[in-house]
């Protein structure tokens, strides 16, 4: 792949920052080189965005105009689904089938917000007094910042860019340093779809440089970030200092609960998918497993059988379940947590190491891992590992279970497996999590809001709520009678 250029104000140009590279996690080969954006590039992108969103042609555009662009974006994504899936796989190592699913979900996101902006647009009459007409309307914020992670680039980028554009904003997209390919290709797709110049700029670069400066810039009116909790906490402070909104989708240490009446096969398969798909590199991964003591032995036996049968390999190979981790540095971090778990008294039942297959030697692969023998207070149960590592724990008392499931600084997601729907709903109300799955896991609907409790984030993405998050509300009062205010008489 040729050297990449960054995208600013409708122009492709060489970044002014230091050289950076994109590597294929499956074998370490070079995907592309590019020069990162620098602060001058950032200034130009914000200036271009400010001009573009204030342009009356865009500011006064009817919702169907923005919807048409988003539908065209969806058409272009769908027409190139296989190509984009390969690019996504090269960007972060996801198996092709999984990458293609994310590509298609990105197209669906564009279509959803195309429809949503038409439903939401316009003045809404509100209850009023005699001789007074009151209206409420939603307006764009202006230039907004979207800072995205490396684990699901095209999906997470579209979940920010599509509603922001639908709402009428100009977006500065800062992709993760490790995965610039999809963000830059997304810019090309929006350009081909007819989005006016300046409404989307893409600035690859270091988060500590570009991300921080973007968040601090006085003309940036919202920060939306998906990534680590420490960075999210820093950005929340920056937003608070500026008194601007911040949407933060952060880490997780999600509990999965298996009650004594659960279907063993259904639960084992769902648990396996919930932790080991995406090689465990998902904020929602079900990494803490609580199994009722009466079901512990049979469920663990089936879960181990399924896990040992997972195919770990090159993401372009047929039938692969688990691809590589993003890079060797991250893999070492996962391995360090496994070693820590052993020191804390954990027993590794499967995995816990780098695969011995010489064909995988150049990639950042790690075997799916199941550990038992730890308590919920262990660091491996409290800290986000972000890899294919599951810790299993038996429980007997339901009240103690709820306390332990909620004993985490995180509150992103949870799963429940049971045949008793009423009991599951009762449990779901007691779990401190933004999303609770019952007899399924890691499935989504773009129409349903998503976000976390506690240190898993602030705000919501997806759904109408996810569109309103990119807008500000204005109230208008119009006197309809001829009455005169006599206060100053």
What are the residue ranges of the model-derived segments?
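Short, well-ordered beta-strand elements within core beta-sheets of diverse protein domains
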Residues: 31-37, 54-58, 146, 256-259, ...
């Amino acid at each position: 792949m040729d050297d990449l250029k960054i995208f600013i104000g409708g122009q492709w140009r060489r970044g002014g920052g230091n050289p950076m590279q994109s590597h294929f996690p499956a074998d370490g080969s070079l995907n592309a080189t590019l020069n990162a954006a620098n602060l001058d590039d950032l200034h130009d992108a914000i200036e271009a965005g400010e001009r573009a969103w204030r342009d009356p042609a865009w500011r006064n555009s009817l919702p169907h105009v923005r919807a048409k662009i988003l539908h065209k974006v969806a058409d272009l994504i769908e027409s190139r689904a296989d190509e984009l899936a390969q690019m996504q796989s090269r960007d972060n190592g996801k198996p092709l089938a999984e990458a293609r699913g994310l590509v298609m979900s990105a197209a669906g996101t564009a279509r959803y917000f195309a429809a949503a902006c038409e439903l939401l647009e316009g003045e809404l009459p509100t209850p009023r007094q005699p001789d007074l007409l009151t209206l409420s309307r939603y307006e764009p914020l202006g230039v907004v910042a979207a800072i995205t992670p490396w684990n699901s680039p095209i999906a997470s980028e579209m979940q920010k860019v599509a509603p922001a554009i639908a709402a009428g904003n100009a977006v500065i997209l800062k992709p993760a340093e490790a995965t610039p390919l999809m963000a830059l290709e997304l810019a090309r797709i929006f350009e081909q779809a007819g989005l006016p110049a300046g409404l989307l700029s893409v600035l690859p670069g270091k988060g500590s440089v570009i991300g921080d400066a973007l968040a601090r810039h006085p003309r940036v009116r919202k920060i939306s970030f998906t990534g680590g909790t420490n960075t999210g906490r820093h950005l929340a402070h920056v937003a608070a200092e500026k008194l601007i909104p911040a949407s933060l989708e952060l880490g997780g240490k999600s509990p999965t609960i298996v009650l004594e009446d659960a279907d063993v096969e259904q639960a084992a398969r769902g648990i396996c998918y919930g932790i080991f798909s995406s090689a465990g590199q998902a904020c929602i991964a079900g990494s803490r497993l609580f199994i009722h003591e009466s079901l512990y032995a049979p469920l663990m036996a089936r879960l181990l059988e399924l896990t040992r049968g997972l195919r770990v390999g090159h993401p372009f190979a047929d039938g692969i379940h688990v691809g590589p981790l993003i890079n060797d540095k991250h893999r070492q971090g996962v391995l360090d947590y496994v070693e820590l778990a052993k020191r804390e008294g954990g027993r590794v039942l499967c995995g816990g190491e780098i695969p011995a297959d010489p064909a995988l030697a150049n990639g950042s692969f790690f075997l799916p891992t199941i550990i038992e023998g730890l308590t919920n207070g262990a660091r491996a149960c409290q800290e986000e590992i972000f890899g294919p590592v599951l810790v299993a724990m038996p429980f007997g008392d339901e009240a103690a279970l709820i306390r332990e499931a909620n004993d985490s600084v995180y509150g992103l997601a949870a799963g429940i497996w049971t045949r008793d729907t009423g009991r599951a709903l009762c449990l779901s109300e007691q779990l401190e999590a933004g999303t609770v799955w019952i007899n399924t896991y890691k499935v989504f609907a773009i129409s349903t809001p998503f976000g976390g409790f506690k240190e898993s984030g602030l705000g919501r993405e997806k759904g109408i709520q996810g569109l309103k998050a990119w807008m500000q509300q204005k109230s208008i009062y119009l006197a309809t009678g001829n009455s005169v205010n006599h206060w100053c008489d």
